[in-house]
Amino acid sequence: MTKILSLFNNEYDLAKAIQKGNRKAQNRLYEKYASKMLAVCSRYVSDKMEAEDVMIDGFMRIFDKIDQFGFQGSFEGWVRKIMVNEALMFVRSKKMINVDLEAAIEEPNSFEFSSDIEAEELLKMIDSLPTGYKMVFNLFAIEGFSHQEIAEKLGISEGTSKSQLSRARAFLQEKLKQNEFSNKRIHHS
């Protein structure tokens, strides 16, 4: 097995081998990125089984579209982008995006996390966001998309994207305050 792994010294060698239809390279891609990409899919699709299905569909799309990878930029970034798009298509197909169409343009609040909060706790808070808020928050804060790109991907206006992000941040800040308050009560008891 180590011989197989050493054949693909970097992500570009791996991509080239996949473009040539090399099954071992496809396996290697899956082994290398499955857990990361499942985490990406899970940010958009809460149900674990559905997130796994989305991830598998994403890998199938990668294998179908591998010739479109132009060796400019990160291969992992290209893979991640496909996974995000696959998750968004799944959510759209299930009509799970319930976006507030009021499109009130609000400037994002300054968003500060308590240094005491654990990453796992924060991920749970993000997962508890209403679907529309969660989608925009993940795309903007985690994936790094612009409001224009988010608007195009979700079929909403830029103003709605900004509003959803602002509301997601306010929601998370409120959860953080509640968390800090309950932690202080525990420490003072």
List where the protein language model places each region.
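Structural recognition of an alpha-helix C-terminal capping motif at a helix-to-coil junction
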Residues: A39, D53-M60, G73-N85
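Sigma70-family region 2
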Residues: Q19-K20, S46, I56-S74, S93-K94
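DNA-recognition helix of helix-turn-helix
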Residues: V84, L88, I142, L154-Q178
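Arg/Lys-rich amphipathic alpha helix in sigma70-family domain 2
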Residues: D67-F71, K81-L101, R167
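A short pre-motif secondary-structure segment
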Residues: V136-F140
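A short, charge-rich alpha-helical start-of-domain segment used by transcription regulators
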Residues: A15-A39
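C-terminal edge and immediately downstream basic/flexible tail or linker adjoining helix-turn-helix-like DNA-binding
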Residues: M1-F8, A17, E152-G155, R169-S189
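Internal acidic/polar
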Residues: L7-E11, M89, M96-K124, S146
